[in-house]
Amino acid sequence: DRGFGRSGYPAISMSAQAAESFCKWLSTRTNQTISIPTIEQWNSANTSDGGAWHKWNADKSTHPIATTKPNSLGIYDMRGNVGEWVTTKDGPRVIGGSFRTPAEEIGPSSLLTPIKDWNITDPQLPRSPWWFADADFVGLRIVINEGDFNE
């Protein structure tokens, strides 16, 4: 699907640059400090329970958000449906697995480094820094950080 976050579906196909820019934009709109989670934040929010859309049950497509069981912290879709950007000491990565990931690989062990093939069919020249034409399995989760907002 190319819903890009509309109609209750996860926002997909965005590059790390686009995800970071969205967080900055949303921060200024809400006067809150919003960011992509660090890998440590993501791991703290991830528990081994809760539902997940994966290769064996997703029928080759993303699904509306919050349609599986939440984890014990009450957070939906931490694993599966779409992989999520996190920041690491080695740069941005995609974690959690997606609707294309086998069930046994869903979770924190599914950690991907972005590759050029995620944008191979982008018709723009130069290729877009904002979206990945071939990475409909990459999405975004945001973190609202405590403290004062700084532009």
Residue ranges of model-derived segments:
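Short, structured beta-strand segments at or near domain termini in extracellular proteins/domains
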Residues: 136-150
